[in-house]
From Swiss-Prot:
Native organism: Saccharomyces cerevisiae (strain ATCC 204508 / S288c) (Baker's yeast)
GO CC terms: membrane; peroxisome
Residue ranges of the TM segments: 10-30
Keyword Transmembrane in annotation: yes
Protein's name according to its UniProt entry: Putative UPF0377 protein YHL045W
Length: 115
């Protein structure tokens, strides 16, 4: 499945309330099957995943290196459409972006999920 990759920010939506948490170093993917975008973390070291971006001497954002191995699964996690690439609900795990409050939650939230 072809994916387009963008580096961006996101908010967590829990119980229809935006917590306004910014995800640094995460990836925004666009599903080639249904065209919906969703946020997804890369399989990177723990400290890298939760590291804030660094600003270069030119004032540009520098993000961590993302390395995708053969075990990294590209799946559509958008709840806004029915897509053949969506995983079963029980496989979806949400990670909060704080090292102090890393929580696994087995329920789908609005567009923010990891496997």
């Amino acid at each position: 499945m072809k994916m387009l990759l963008f580096l961006n920010e996101a908010c967590i939506f829990i119980d229809s309330v935006c917590e306004g948490i910014v995800f640094w170093g995460l990836c925004l993917f666009v599903c080639a099957e249904c065209g919906n975008a969703y946020y997804r973390g890369a399989r990177v070291p723990y400290k890298t995943l939760f590291r804030a971006f660094e600003v270069s001497v030119f004032g540009q954002k520098e993000y961590p290196n993302f390395r995708f191995g053969p075990s990294y699964r590209f799946l559509c996690l958008s709840p806004y459409s029915i897509c053949c690439k969506q995983p079963p609900m029980e496989e979806v795990i949400l990670y909060y972006p704080s090292p102090d409050s890393l929580i696994k939650n087995r329920k789908r939230v609005l567009g923010v999920a990891y496997l």
